[in-house]
């Protein structure tokens, strides 16, 4: 049975999720509906031409209420209220809620009222039935979870590495810094924002700010609840971020062991989600990398046998968008 998906919100993640669907050639799903309040012409143009990921594969055509990116016509709706999106009329199984505006169970459940069977939210979601990081806790997904959170791009990078360490050498405490590319909520020139640092010009400063990733990693890996803290520094690059994780371990370990553990996970149970790098690369080299997390083995450090540092790269747009589709398939198995 082919899963029928809708994308609601056609910004960075919505567009990249559609591109990932096209590039990965998912045979077990089809995108039947996209909801975006803006003009269809704008959606089609921004899908086809992207400053970060280049031009889309294939030919893009559109009409008044449809767009075709190479897999047949997709109906385009322009509703601002999710309750009015024609999910029922298009037989939508799962909505990928990518607008960034309905990040609570109550708000995103409007999609269910409109006829969708399940909702997958592309962000941390307050009171979600479950938060699932694919490759880390997707085995815990249940049939009765109607609103599922895909967590954040940073949680998707942190959680695989944290799980590998927690399951082997143990984590007593950990601190994560994400050195993060600027995102669409930051201005090009100083502007008002409730976070006075995020109010500043994105491409001109390193900007210390908060991250919810360490809190939500405790939801995904309950054994780490209360053991992790973290912060973010937004830097003047357009895409690709890096998690710098430092933990104290429960037992003695070595640099060699840590790298062996990460390599074994990347080649085994976390293949496709966790990657490894052993070459002298920089952030742009990970643009369009489909992994959630790429551990850079050249940067691993172990001090006094118990203070461990791991660096993990992630394309904060593309990797996360690929996981939206993986989680949709996982949720679809219950339909």
What is the role of each PLM region?
Residues 37-40, 125-126, 152-154, 178-185, ...:
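Glycine-rich beta-alpha junction loops
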Residues 18, 109, 159-166, 177, ...:
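Predominant activation on well-ordered alpha-helical scaffold segments within soluble catalytic domains
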Residues 167, 171-238:
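Acidic, glycine-rich segments within the central catalytic cores of soluble metabolic enzymes
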Residues 76-81, 226-227, 292:
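Short gly/ser/thr-rich secondary-structure transition/capping motifs
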Residues 67, 132-134, 147, 189, ...:
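Short clusters of hydrophobic/aromatic residues that line enzyme substrate/ligand-binding pockets
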Residues 1-199, 302, 324-326, 334:
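N-terminal Rossmann-like NAD(P) cofactor-binding subdomain of oxidoreductases
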Residues 10, 14, 104, 151-154, ...:
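Generic structural signal for well-ordered, non-membrane alpha-helical segments
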Residues 2-3, 230, 242, 246-335:
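C-terminal active-site/capping subdomain that shapes the small-molecule cofactor and substrate pocket
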């Amino acid at each position: 049975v082919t899963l029928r998906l809708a994308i609601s919100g056609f910004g960075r993640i919505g567009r990249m999720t559609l591109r990932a669907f096209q590039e990965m050639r998912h045979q077990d799903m089809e995108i039947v509906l996209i909801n975006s309040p803006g003009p269809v012409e704008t959606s089609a143009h921004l899908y086809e031409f992207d400053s970060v990921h280049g031009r889309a594969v294939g030919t893009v055509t559109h009409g008044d209420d449809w767009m075709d990116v190479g897999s047949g016509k997709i109906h385009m709706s322009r509703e601002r209220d999710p309750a009015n999106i024609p999910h029922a009329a298009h037989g939508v199984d799962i909505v990928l809620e990518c607008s960034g505006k309905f990040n609570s169970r109550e708000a995103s459940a409007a999609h269910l009222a409109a006829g969708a069977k399940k909702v997958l939210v592309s962000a941390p979601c307050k009171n979600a039935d479950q938060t699932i990081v694919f490759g880390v806790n997707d085995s815990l997904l249940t049939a009765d979870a109607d609103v599922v959170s895909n967590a954040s791009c940073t949680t998707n990078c942190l959680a695989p590495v944290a799980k590998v360490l927690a399951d082997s050498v143990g984590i007593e405490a950990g601190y994560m810094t994400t050195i993060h590319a600027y995102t669409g909520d930051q201005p090009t020139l100083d502007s008002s924002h409730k976070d006075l640092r995020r109010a500043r010009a994105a491409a001109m400063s390193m900007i210390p700010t908060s991250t919810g990733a360490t809190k939500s990693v405790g939801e995904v890996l309950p054994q780490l609840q209360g053991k992790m803290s973290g912060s973010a520094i937004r830097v003047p690059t357009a895409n690709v971020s890096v998690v710098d994780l430092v933990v104290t371990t429960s037992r003695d370990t070595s640099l060699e062991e840590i790298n062996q553990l990460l390599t074994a996970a990347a080649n085994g149970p976390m293949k496709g989600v966790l990657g490894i790098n052993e070459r002298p690369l920089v952030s742009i080299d990970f643009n369009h990398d489909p992994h959630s997390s790429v551990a850079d083995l050249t940067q691993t450090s172990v001090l006094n046998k118990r203070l461990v540092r791991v660096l993990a790269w992630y394309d904060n747009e593309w990797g996360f968008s690929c996981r939206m589709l993986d989680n949709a398939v996982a949720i679809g198995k219950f339909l």
